[in-house]
Amino acid sequence: MAEFFPEIPKIQFEGKESTNPLAFRFYDPNEVIDGKPLKDHLKFSVAFWHTFVNEGRDPFGDPTAERPWNRFSDPMDKAFARVDALFEFCEKLNIEYFCFHDRDIAPEGKTLRETNKILDKVVERIKERMKDSNVKLLWGTANLFSHPRYMHGAATTCSADVFAYAAAQVKKALEITKELGGEGYVFWGGREGYETLLNTDLGLELENLARFLRMAVEYAKKIGFTGQFLIEPKPKEPTKHQYDFDVATAYAFLKNHGLDEYFKFNIEANHATLAGHTFQHELRMARILGKLGSIDANQGDLLLGWDTDQFPTNIYDTTLAMYEVIKAGGFTKGGLNFDAKVRRASYKVEDLFIGHIAGMDTFALGFKIAYKLAKDGVFDKFIEEKYRSFKEGIGKEIVEGKTDFEKLEEYIIDKEDIELPSGKQEYLESLLNSYIVKTIAELR
């Protein structure tokens, strides 16, 4: 089979001093940390949509990307070419997972029946390529936002016919995700929300969204799909207000409808930015709720108000993100999916590789720093000391539910001064810097 990327070699680890843009500086997939290869800690994944479908189009300009599969004019030939290119791409980068929307991998037909038949043909091609590869499916999902039929939403639409279409589309997406051995299935509600409350039945939409998710849970059980269901929060874009605004909002919704036991969260860095949170905040919220499932790895631009989906190169963000993953016990049915696209002006094929290499190196380095932070317990020790008052005396009684307002008033009413510990934020931020510098210095 002819190569799609003949000019790109298999990417090797060359160490931190390397200046080769097509080499890893910090990511050695077989490096063993805490008894496990680095690749199994990180579980990198390629996003089919950004890497093989995005062509550099934006609202102000035409496509710019030079892609080898664009030489195919027939939609099916192009779909098969993209699949073949995916496996070559993953193997050259030593990435073992990929993710997709149903409409990324196959074109739509005139009816859903025809579309499903087309999809089946592409799935067969993927299965054929999987036989000779170690590349696996991390998670699948359905695109319920691009087609005009979803202008009012999918599960939250005003049209029962559209609701039925969306349900049938998710049914098929679940089937092919199971068929391909996917570890999870993602629900992202890009059109599940509203532009104005003047024309919105908020109660009905939220109830229908719960009904939709409950049907998905029931069908997954029926077909024996044991992958992890994941909600991907995002506050806005393309819809003005989306119902899965952030982890806290989405968790409250799931809890309210008795669905929380079936779902975890797929946290995207840029979505946290849009919600006014840090990436770590969303990961921490998911972790303390026991709902940290997977990550869409990217970064946003704080000076822009939209989802820029840039490759992650901020070492502070990746360090603190991996710190939360480590504290959560690591990934099980999840991983680091690069929901990131090269910039429109980075239009060469090699830029696809360079972008992924940059992200993989940054997360690998972040993991190594985070591992040292977690192992040394530097933040844990400080936090434990800061909240020490709740480990003894009246504080312990508060935590154990052995006191009340009257007793607390009696305890405090004659105290003159309360001595508080210092937050020492500046010291802790400086300590984080020290760990970053020290870890890099110790690397070969």
Swiss-Prot record:
What is this protein's name? Answer: Xylose isomerase
Q: Does the keyword Cytoplasm apply?
A: yes
The active site annotation covers 101, 104
Q: Quick one: which gene encodes this?
A: xylA
Where in or outside the cell it occurs: the entry states:
Cytoplasm
Alphabetically, which GO biological process terms does the record hold? D-xylose catabolic process
For this UniProt record, give its keywords in alphabetical order, as a comma-separated list.
Answer: Carbohydrate metabolism, Cytoplasm, Isomerase, Magnesium, Metal-binding, Xylose metabolism
Q: What are the recorded GO MF terms, alphabetically? A: magnesium ion binding; xylose isomerase activity
Note one Pfam family from the annotation: AP_endonuc_2
SUPFAM superfamilies per record: Xylose isomerase-like
Q: Which residues bind Mg(2+) 1?
A: 232, 268, 296, 339
Its Enzyme Commission number(s) read 5.3.1.5
Which cofactor(s) are needed, names only?
Mg(2+)
Q: How is the cofactor bound?
A: Binds 2 magnesium ions per subunit.
The record's subunit annotation is: Homotetramer.
Annotated residues that bind Mg(2+) 2 are located at 268, 271, 307, 309
Where mainly located?
Answer: cytoplasm
- Which protein family is it in? Belongs to the xylose isomerase family.
Is Cytoplasm tagged as a keyword? yes
Q: Which reaction does it catalyse?
A: alpha-D-xylose = alpha-D-xylulofuranose
